[in-house]
Structures are given as C-alpha cells and as structure tokens.
C-alpha cells in the first residue's frame, strides 16, 4: 500500500517480505537480548557499588535496560513469539546478545561495569541514531524513548570514568578493564 508516490507503508510484519521479516526479527532480537543480558549483569553489582548514590544509579540503569528489552521483546511478539519463549523458556544458545554484555565482571573492580557501560552505551547511541529513520515504524517509534534514557546512562559512565581516572591507580584499573573489554566492544 502506498500513499501517492510515497514509500510503501510498513506498519506490521505482514507488510514485509519474508526476507525483511527475518532481518527485522534478527535485528530486534539482538537488541532485546543485549538489553536484557546487560540488565542482568548490572544487577550483580547492586549493593556492591562504591557509594549509595552509585548503587541507586546502577539500579536505575538496570531497570531502564529491562524496560528497553521489554520494548524490543514486545515488538518481537508481533512476529509470533511470546515473551516466555524469547526469555524464560529460551535455550541459552538462542540468545543473540553481544559478548561484551555477557562477560562476567572482573571481581570487585568498579572500573569494569563502568567501562562496559560506556562502551555499550556509545555503541548503542550510534546504533539507535542509525535506526531513527528506519522504514519500519514499529522500530522507529521506540528509538526516541530508548535514546532519552541512554543519554543518562552514558553521562553516568562518563562521570565515573572521569572520577576513576583522576588518580594513577584509577587510571590503571580503567586501562586494565579496557584491555579486557575493548576487543569485545569492536
């Protein structure tokens, strides 16, 4: 269906070719799984952050990431999958998240979740910017909400990176985290 010379309306999965459905589903699944697994990892740091303020901030970030995962998983339900099938009943090998979000944290080092957050959030900023003009409105409509919350996440990580790098020991810890995590952020 077209509007007087405009591009076709792509409002539902049935408006897509099989190839397009497969591509959209794969893209959205990876985005949902990234958010879900990262949120799960962040919960491991709750009550272990260096300050009460940072603990609360990381809890808020984890909650936001769960919310973002829910936005993307809800979209996947349009393609016939249920939330239970996508998350709770899924075989772990069926998850399509980035290795960066899955890696265990370096034991007891706050630099690890902070640098991981920064690397992922910079990637996500670029990824979401690329999706702002998606021809599939069900993706495009979700991007703005996620972007507004991700701005807070990036600022939180940037502020902590500055604090951690304020002294030689902190810079060394951040560098160690970068040596470990950066290859997975590429």
Please name every model-derived segment.
Residues 7-29, 89-116, 134, 167-168, ...:
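Acidic/His metal-coordination segments adjacent to aromatic residues that form catalytic metal sites
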Residues 34-42, 68, 120-127, 153, ...:
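Amphipathic, well-ordered alpha-helical segments in soluble domains
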Residues 61-92, 157-165:
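Conserved alpha-helical segments that form or flank metal/cofactor-binding pockets of metalloenzymes
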């Amino acid at each position: 269906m077209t509007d007087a010379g405009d591009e076709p309306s792509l409002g539902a999965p049935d408006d897509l070719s099989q190839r397009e459905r497969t591509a959209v589903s794969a893209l959205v699944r990876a985005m949902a799984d990234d958010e879900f697994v990262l949120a799960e990892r962040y919960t491991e740091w709750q009550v272990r952050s260096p300050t009460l303020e940072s603990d609360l901030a990381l809890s808020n970030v984890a909650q936001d990431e769960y919310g973002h995962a829910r936005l993307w998983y809800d979209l996947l339900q349009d393609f016939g999958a249920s939330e239970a099938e996508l998350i709770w009943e899924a075989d772990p090998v069926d998850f399509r998240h980035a290795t960066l979000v899955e890696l265990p944290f370096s034991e007891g080092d706050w630099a690890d979740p902070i640098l991981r957050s920064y690397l992922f959030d910079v990637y996500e900023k670029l990824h979401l910017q690329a999706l702002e003009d998606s021809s599939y409105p069900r993706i495009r409509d979700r991007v703005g909400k996620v972007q507004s919350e991700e701005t807070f996440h990036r600022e939180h990580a940037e502020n902590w990176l500055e604090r951690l790098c304020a002294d030689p020991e902190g810079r060394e810890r951040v560098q160690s985290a970068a040596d470990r995590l950066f290859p997975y952020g590429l």
